[in-house]
């Protein structure tokens, strides 16, 4: 297939948009076979079925590399509590927060969880997402964690989107283990990880390293098992405080360290050395009305790749708009529109260990977005506006 009359944002490298005016893209199945100026299309592709894109902007398809779209229940009441002065930590310690979602998720059927998740996934797809990471972590027992991961796998069969799963058993201490996180890690989390891996449900292993969740020693035990199973790792780190999560992620060579509001310059250096991606999540920052901004300048200084995601979840980021996440990253964190677009494409792919996505180049996946926009900065600039004209998934319109 040949796409012509396009203004192509290749993102060939991280320095600029790599814009090709009057460009063309040839695909072969689900891969990009050639990209360049329309005048230079090789003869081998000129006889292909041609689609004139009308001079529209084409970018790599968007990737949401950090979501919790599978969950039961609703936590809108907590929104009111926080507006009345309760902190995220206070809500959690009072039995709300993640634990309230755990109760609802445990009680929901797979069918109900899938139906609810698909409403969120549909919103992401409508703004150009073709790859979504989905975490467990609202079960905190064997059966429900496995149930969540099975539902996550079913999303890819129910919708034209790819899904990568992350086992997040170390998300919170469930009520039945209150005050005894070590027993939970050893008796529930690690055995469940083994079971999920045996069932083929896990692509990566995640954890929440924070004062209200698990410390570095507890997370390390989970990561050691992940290593034995050959699974890559990710980590929620330095969202509400700094207890060494980012350094831990770097030591383990994690794919990503996520949130990272309280990361330091030394943490940024560690991420750069390990090649770990910093995933910033402005939806949670915004919803929780936080004031500590991720150290974007340090990430730039040390050439740490910055990814960006919705963090769609019921408590701290009920966000299903990647375009709004891009705007938030620019407005709240002072990222540039180029950084935001890279964060939702090439760097998001890196945060998932995907090497063939996020850029428009020969050999890459033919996942593309066609936009009614003049310049790529418009994607992060406008609010409440979806300029998506067409989403191309695996080379198919």
UniProtKB/Swiss-Prot annotation:
Q: Name one GO cellular component term.
A: cytoplasm
Pfam families of this UniProt entry? Answer: Amidohydro_3
Q: Which residues form a coiled coil?
A: none
**Which pathway does it operate in?**
Amino-acid degradation; L-histidine degradation into L-glutamate; N-formimidoyl-L-glutamate from L-histidine: step 3/3
Cofactor remark from the record:
Binds 1 zinc or iron ion per subunit.
Q: What GO biological process terms are annotated to this protein in UniProt?
A: L-histidine catabolic process to glutamate and formamide; L-histidine catabolic process to glutamate and formate
Q: Which cofactor does it need?
A: Zn(2+); Fe(3+)
Instruction: Give the matching CDD domains.
Output: Imidazolone-5PH
Q: What keywords does the record list, in alphabetical order?
A: Cytoplasm, Histidine metabolism, Hydrolase, Iron, Metal-binding, Zinc
Amino-acid positions noted as binding Zn(2+) in the UniProt annotation, renumbered to this chain: 66, 68, 236, 311
Catalytic function, reaction form: 4-imidazolone-5-propanoate + H2O = N-formimidoyl-L-glutamate
Chief localization class? cytoplasm
What would you give as a GO molecular function for this chain, any one? Answer: imidazolonepropionase activity
Annotated Fe(3+) binding lies at 66, 68, 236, 311
Q: Give the protein's function.
A: Catalyzes the hydrolytic cleavage of the carbon-nitrogen bond in imidazolone-5-propanoate to yield N-formimidoyl-L-glutamate. It is the third step in the universal histidine degradation pathway.
Q: What is this protein called?
A: Imidazolonepropionase
Gene source species = Roseobacter denitrificans (strain ATCC 33942 / OCh 114)
Gene of this entry: hutI
């Amino acid at each position: 297939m040949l796409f012509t009359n396009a203004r192509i944002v290749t993102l060939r490298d991280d320095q600029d948009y790599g814009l090709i005016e009057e460009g063309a893209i040839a695909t072969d199945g689900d891969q990009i076979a050639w990209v360049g100026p329309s005048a230079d299309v090789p003869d081998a592709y000129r006889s292909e079925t041609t689609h004139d894109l009308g001079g529209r902007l084409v970018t790599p398809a968007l990737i949401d590399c950090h979501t919790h779209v599978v969950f039961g229940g609703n936590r809108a009441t907590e929104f009111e509590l926080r507006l009345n002065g309760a902190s995220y930590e206070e809500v959690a310690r009072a039995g709300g927060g993640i634990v309230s979602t755990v109760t609802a998720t445990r009680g929901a059927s797979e069918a109900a969880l899938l139906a609810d998740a698909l409403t969120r996934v549909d919103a992401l797809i409508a703004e150009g997402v073709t790859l979504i990471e989905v975490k467990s972590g609202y079960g905190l027992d064997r059966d429900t964690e496995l149930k969540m991961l099975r539902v996550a796998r079913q999303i890819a069969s129910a919708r034209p989107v790819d899904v990568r799963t992350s086992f997040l058993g170390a998300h919170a201490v469930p009520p039945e283990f209150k005050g005894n996180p070590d027993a939970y890690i050893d008796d529930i989390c690690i055995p469940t990880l083994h079971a999920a891996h045996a069932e083929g449900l896990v692509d990566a292993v995640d954890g929440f390293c924070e004062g209200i969740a698990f410390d570095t020693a507890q997370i390390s035990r989970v990561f050691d098992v992940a290593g034995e199973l050959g699974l890559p790792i990710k980590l929620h780190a330095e969202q509400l405080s700094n207890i060494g999560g980012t350094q831990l992620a770097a030591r383990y060579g994690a794919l990503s360290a996520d949130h990272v509001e309280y990361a330091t310059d030394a943490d940024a250096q560690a991420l750069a050395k390990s090649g770990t991606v910093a995933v910033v999540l402005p939806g949670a920052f915004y919803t929780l009305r936080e004031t500590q901004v991720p150290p974007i300048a340090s990430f730039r200084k040390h050439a740490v790749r910055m990814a960006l995601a919705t963090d769609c979840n019921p408590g701290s980021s009920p966000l299903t708009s990647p375009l709004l996440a891009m705007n938030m990253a620019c407005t709240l964190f002072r990222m540039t529109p180029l950084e935001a677009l890279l964060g939702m494409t090439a760097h998001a792919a890196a945060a998932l260990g995907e090497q063939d996505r996020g850029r428009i180049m020969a050999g890459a996946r033919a996942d593309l977005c066609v936009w009614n926009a003049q310049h790529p900065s418009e994607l992060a600039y406008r609010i409440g506006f979806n300029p998506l004209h067409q989403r191309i998934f695996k080379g198919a319109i």
